Each structure stands twice: as structure tokens, then as C-alpha cells.
């Protein structure tokens, strides 16, 4: 009996150790060729590390990833295209990524608010016909960090939000750093509702941003467009604001630190007639906007006051006609000076207006240039009034 019990205990211990090895194998796998990578995906490995310098995953269809994993390219190059779906949380990082497929990555949403589909791209160099397509069909979060991406095909884009325009089911997208370039189309197409944030990045190519639905905020980013193609169907606008008829909202916020310029056409192409009952707004709170080679800031001026609101920024070289057209778009206390800068309106003598800066520090009196001490000015005005009453 004792011998039997001992054998049983040894067998259990052996199986436990074996399970540890199996679990460890399932958690991480080094891949050297296409077969290794296909096996790692089939086994749903939590960490996949590329060791081969170039691995062409030559499948006819998208490779579907519906499990949590980190794909570490480890400085190597992968040829493939993926679909991330069903609440999977996927990170792809540290290497080159290319494909002739269209798009290179498709992200499909999750039905579970507590378990969104997540795609994180870090330190990648991507070349593809088209880049990342995010479907507004469920809860989704996408982050693109310090990634260089080139979309090379006709009407190719680096990021596209597609599907529903009526409402945001929980689609959040962040681009932080990196360089996104589209050779023959818009860099970013917001065709479906989402919350998009772009900061500290560089965007460029034939055209910039297409806004048809959702909300996009951009700050500390360079957006430079130039289209040298003779094909008239390739867009040239740096920012095209054409709200979809059924969109719940179309809101573009251009904040401080942006450098936005166009060499081939107008910076803004706005179609306010397409709004209908849509909440549509372009809020310019800072940044510099330069239309080069004689191009206008706006492709057309009619109706822009219905969409554009300006509280900061600089527009060097703006024409008198455009400056006049922007007057209804300006906040009440500001104007555009002769150099194209947004500035406080000149005040009548003796009138004190306090304009807080971005750090909420008090700035100078726009009428005299003298520093403003809000409490001191208030007390002094009371003293002056009392003195006048005594007299």
C-alpha cells in the first residue's frame, strides 16, 4: 500500500511539473519561420518573439487573433495582415511590418464594455497598401505609439474609422508620436464615430484629415501636405470637413503647438451644407496655419461662420478677404491682427480686461501693455470712485 501511494504521489508530481512546462510553452514561443509563427498563433501563445530576420506569413486570408498576445518582432520584419477581434488585447512592437493585403490590420469591436478589443502598436515601421482599419462595431481601443507608417496605394490611408456614424459605441484611438504618411490619399479618415486624439506626431502626404463623423483632437503635431500627382481624383486638402448626413457629431479641435501647412491646396475644405441636423464644429484654440504657393486658407468662405470657432492661433499671410470672413468666427474679445495672429482687441482708455494665459497667470493690459494686478486694479477703482463721491 505504501509503495502504491508513493507511486501515485510521484505520478502526480510528474504531471504537475509537465503541466508547468506545457503552460510555459503556451505562454511564450520563439519563432524562426512561417510554420513556427502559424503554430504559435494556433496555440494562442501569450508572447511570440520573432527570431527570423524576415518571415512571410503567406496566408490567403487575414490571420485572425482573438486572444491576448504580445508579438515582439525583435528588430525583424514580418509580412502578414491581421484581424484583431472578440475582445483580444494585442501588442505588436519593435520591428518592421509590411503586407500587400488591404488593410494591414483590421480591428473589430467587442460586445463587452469591460473587455474591449485592444490593439497597441509600439516602435514599428509599417509599409502597406492601407494601414489600420478600426470598425465602429463595438468597444475598441487603439494606440499607435512612436510608429512610422506609410500607406502607398491609391486612396490609401494610415488610419480609418469606418462603419456607424450615428454614435460611438466606445471607440477610442490615440496616436502619440511617430510619423504617418499617405502617398495618394488622406492620412486619417474619420468615416465612423470615434474619439480620436493625436499628439506629438508628424502627419503628411497628399492629403491630411478627412472628418465625416466623430471627434478628433490634435495638438503639438506637424501636418504638412503636398500632392504632386496629375490625377485629379487624388485629394489635396489638408483638412476636409464634410459631415455625414446621419452623423451624431463631427467635432474637430485643433489645439496649441500644431504646425499645419499645405503646398498643393487649401488647408480647409468645409461643406457646411452637408450638415443637416448634425452637431458640427471646428474649434481652433492654437497652432500655426500656413497655405503656401498662393493657395487660400479655406477653399470657400461661404457659411464657415456656422462651423468654425477661433479663440487662438496664427494665420501668417492670410488675405484681407479671409480675415474679414473669419471675423464672425472669433471669440468676442479677440481679433486677427495685420500679421495674421489672433490678438486681444484694443481696449478703450481706462478699460481693464484680464486675459489669462495657458497657466492661468495674469497677462498685460491689451490697451496699454502694462501688467495687470487684478486685485490691485479692483481696489484702486473703488478708491477712485470713493474719491469722486467726496468731491
Model-found features: residue ranges?
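N-terminal hydrophobic targeting signals that begin at the initiator methionine
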Residues: 1-4, 391
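Sec-dependent N-terminal signal peptides of Gram-positive bacterial secreted proteins and lipoproteins
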Residues: 6-26, 377, 381, 385
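N-terminal capping/linker segments that flank leucine-rich repeat
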Residues: 26-50, 342-344, 351-354
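N-terminal extracellular ligand-recognition/capping segment immediately after the signal peptide
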Residues: 32-37, 45-69, 73-80, 97, ...
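Surface-exposed loop/turn motifs in large extracellular/passenger domains
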Residues: 64-70, 83-153, 158-185, 189-264, ...
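C-terminal cell-surface addressing/anchoring modules of secreted/extracellular proteins
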Residues: 349-391
Amino acid at each position: 500500500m505504501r509503495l502504491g501511494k508513493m507511486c501515485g504521489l510521484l505520478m502526480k508530481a510528474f504531471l504537475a511539473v509537465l503541466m508547468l512546462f506545457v503552460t510555459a510553452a503556451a505562454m511564450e514561443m520563439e519563432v524562426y519561420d512561417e510554420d513556427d509563427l502559424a503554430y504559435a498563433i494556433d496555440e494562442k501563445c501569450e508572447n511570440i518573439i520573432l527570431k527570423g530576420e524576415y518571415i512571410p506569413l503567406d496566408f490567403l486570408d487575414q490571420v485572425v487573433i482573438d486572444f491576448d498576445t504580445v508579438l515582439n518582432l525583435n528588430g525583424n520584419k514580418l509580412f502578414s495582415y491581421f484581424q484583431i477581434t472578440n475582445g483580444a488585447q494585442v501588442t505588436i512592437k519593435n520591428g518592421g511590418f509590411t503586407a500587400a493585403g488591404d488593410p494591414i490590420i483590421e480591428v473589430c469591436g467587442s460586445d463587452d464594455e469591460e473587455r474591449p478589443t485592444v490593439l497597441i502598436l509600439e516602435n514599428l515601421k509599417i509599409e502597406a497598401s492601407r494601414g489600420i482599419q478600426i470598425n465602429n462595431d463595438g468597444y475598441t481601443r487603439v494606440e499607435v505609439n512612436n510608429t512610422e507608417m506609410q500607406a502607398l496605394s491609391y486612396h490609401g490611408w494610415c488610419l480609418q474609422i469606418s462603419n456607424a456614424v450615428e454614435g460611438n459605441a466606445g471607440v477610442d484611438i490615440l496616436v502619440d508620436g511617430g510619423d504617418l504618411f499617405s502617398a495618394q490619399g488622406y492620412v486619417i479618415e474619420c468615416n465612423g464615430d470615434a474619439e480620436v486624439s493625436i499628439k506629438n506626431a508628424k502627419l503628411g502626404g497628399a492629403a491630411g484629415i478627412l472628418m465625416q463623423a466623430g471627434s478628433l483632437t490634435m495638438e503639438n503635431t506637424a501636418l504638412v501636405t503636398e500632392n504632386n500627382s496629375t490625377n485629379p481624383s487624388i485629394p489635396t486638402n489638408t483638412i476636409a470637413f464634410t459631415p455625414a448626413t446621419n452623423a451624431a457629431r463631427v467635432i474637430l479641435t485643433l489645439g496649441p503647438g500644431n504646425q499645419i501647412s499645405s503646398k498643393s491646396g487649401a488647408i480647409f475644405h468645409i461643406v457646411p451644407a452637408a450638415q443637416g441636423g448634425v452637431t458640427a464644429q471646428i474649434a481652433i484654440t492654437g497652432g500655426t496655419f500656413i497655405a503656401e504657393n498662393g493657395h487660400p486658407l479655406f477653399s470657400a468662405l461661404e457659411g464657415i461662420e456656422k462651423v468654425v470657432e477661433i479663440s487662438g492661433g496664427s494665420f501668417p499671410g492670410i488675405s484681407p478677404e479671409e480675415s474679414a470672413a473669419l471675423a464672425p468666427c472669433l471669440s468676442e474679445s479677440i481679433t486677427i491682427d495685420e500679421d495674421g495672429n489672433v490678438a486681444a482687441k484694443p481696449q478703450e482708455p481706462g478699460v481693464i480686461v484680464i486675459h489669462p494665459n495657458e497657466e492661468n497667470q495674469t497677462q498685460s493690459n491689451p490697451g496699454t501693455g502694462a501688467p495687470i494686478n487684478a486685485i490691485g486694479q479692483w481696489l484702486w477703482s473703488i478708491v477712485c470712485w470713493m474719491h469722486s463721491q467726496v468731491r
